[in-house]
């Protein structure tokens, strides 16, 4: 050992670098002494209880925070181990509050731990600020009541330290604000109100912070278990249909059957540029039971020469127009009836006789004789149309029956 010391001393006097074996020895010595130094520092750390007047052997919050900030850089360990060592320095209310906070937030870091300690036990705020923060602390949307009570306790301790609330009234004030600012189930709310009425003059009998947390968590566990038992299980096809609606995805007809009326309602999806009203057809599934000659029921009457039959794109047939004696719908078999739509007519000008515009927007400068001639031609066409319809009176009704 003496030779090693002499060699190290001579090397340092000559400003020469240390040999490799010296570096290895110093690293081993540091690894051996580091845990011992940390344990000695832990034994010398003062404890903090969270009380307004610290007991013998306990420190104020400011002194406790100073020594924690001094030893934290020397703790070369995980965040979880650091939190465990910090918890060992707490006693009384401070330990219980931080234990509950850690239970509510399993991923709590050291920085968040110290920030919460400052909020609960740090410097007192002004009386006006502390008063406003406490009485304006409300339960957030989706927040559990147990977590809300922890937030409320932080503001309550600040208000007590600011001197606006008496410590002997803490239990009553906590309960009153909880009933005002939290959404509780009916049973728990009734129990807490009953306790307030029963012990109005014996506030020491009211539940304190820890007892209140226990009551709330028992109710939350019961509610969670009850909801899991009563929650209905949805079938797989229904959820898939709800997740991916079929509306406006194609022209495939949808049939809705009813056991009471034995009929089908056929619907074909519209295109985006079709603004016409649709005709909904309700046809019996059993044509043999329908009285002879009775026309099928329609949701709304349509002129027979104003309908357009639209087939599904999956069918081989193309779109077809109905004639003046057409029925307005197509029957490909039992229960396979397509819905009909109105035909879009072009506009004819009564002034010049051309199509594509009306009389009010006509730009042609024709004489009155031309106007009268066009009018006579139009009247003749209407007369011939009426005569042809009278010659075949039963053509409409015969063609409208489904085959």
Curated annotation (Swiss-Prot):
Residues 312-324 have a biased composition (Polar residues). One of its GO terms (cellular component) is nucleus. The keyword Zinc applies. Residues 383-403 have a biased composition (Basic and acidic residues). The keyword 4Fe-4S does not apply. It comes from the Eukaryota. A zinc finger (CCHC-type) spans 347-364. Keywords: Metal-binding, Zinc, Zinc-finger. Residues 312-337, 382-403 are annotated as: Disordered. GO terms for molecular function: zinc ion binding. InterPro entries: PNMA, PNMA_C. Belongs to the ZCCHC12 family. PANTHER family: PARANEOPLASTIC ANTIGEN (PTHR23095), ZINC FINGER CCHC DOMAIN-CONTAINING PROTEIN 18 (PTHR23095:SF48). This is Zinc finger CCHC domain-containing protein 18. It comes from Homo sapiens. The lineage of its organism: Eukaryota, Metazoa, Chordata, Craniata, Vertebrata.
